[in-house]
Design a protein with these regions (language model features):
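The identity of the second residue at the extreme N-terminus of proteins
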Residues: 1-3
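ABC family nucleotide-binding domain
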Residues: 5-225
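C-terminal boundary and immediately downstream tail of ABC-type ATPase nucleotide-binding domains
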Residues: 222, 226-247
Length: 247
């Protein structure tokens, strides 16, 4: 029996014009749970994440994160988003700022920390991702893997209750993926609640509590990793897993 969910979405729909991208998705995630979302391109995985923190406005449905109704017009969305860290495929770092500057910007502008407080918290976050010695480097002086670790540090510095990862390794050279996954494993060990959209199936098998398979805007099937990867019940899931295992 799942404890009271920290993330709860009900009946999520999202339209982009005539395109119906999410078709009534329900999602519950318990505190400290790591949920992996897999599926073909265009299945709605990234849109689901972006609807959870209202980077995209759902067309219908409800989203509650850590007790906050994310779709209530009275909700201070910037304050609410401090509880939801998000890491993107494309890093989204400011190129003219140092690694530390990128991490501390939101601490000062959103969380209202003094520069000294922000710098201390920022250095702690960079240390957690193994980049304290790169604090003074700009993104152009860092590898793609290091840039993504700075992006993770930026998110965790705000001490979120939930972390969303949208294909965090898909823009990286293969040899750089491991360092990012190791940081995610460390977050997992620390008890962070995480929802991950990724093609890193090995990581999903080894680290996830639960795997959701999405297709055409719907959750087709969900279950423990061994059930989804070894014995899926739905034909569409079997076809997808078979295809990725052949490559």
């Amino acid at each position: 029996m799942m404890s009271k969910p920290i993330v709860e979405a009900r009946g999520l729909h999202k339209h982009f014009g005539h395109l119906h991208v999410l078709k009534g998705v329900d999602l519950e995630v318990a505190e400290r749970e790591l949920v992996f979302v897999i599926g073909p391109s265009g299945s709605g995985k990234s849109t689901l994440l972006r609807c959870l923190n209202r980077l995209e406005e759902p067309s219908a449905g409800s989203v509650v994160v850590d007790g906050i109704d994310m779709l209530d017009p009275r909700t201070d969305i910037n304050h609410a988003r401090q509880r939801i860290g998000m890491v993107f495929q494309s890093f989204n770092l400011y190129p003219h700022m140092t690694a530390l500057g990128n991490v501390t910007l939101a601490l000062r502008k959103v969380a209202g920390k003094s520069r000294a407080e922000a710098d201390a918290l920022g250095m702690t976050a960079l240390q957690r991702v193994g980049l304290a010695d790169r604090a003074g480097h700009t993104p152009g002086q860092l590898s793609g893997g290091q840039q993504q670790r700075v992006a993770i540090a930026r998110a965790i510095a705000l001490e979120p209750r939930v972390m969303l990862f949208d294909e965090p390794t898909s823009a990286l050279d293969p040899e750089l993926v491991g360092s990012v996954l190791e940081v995610m494993r460390d977050l997992r060990r620390s008890g962070m609640t995480m929802i991950v959209v990724s093609h890193e199936m090995g990581f999903a098998r080894n680290a996830a509590d639960r795997v959701l398979f999405m297709d055409h805007g719907l959750v087709v099937e969900q279950g423990p990793p061994n059930a989804i990867f070894e014995n899926p019940s739905q034909e569409r899931t079997r076809a997808f897993i078979g295809q990725i295992q052949r490559h």
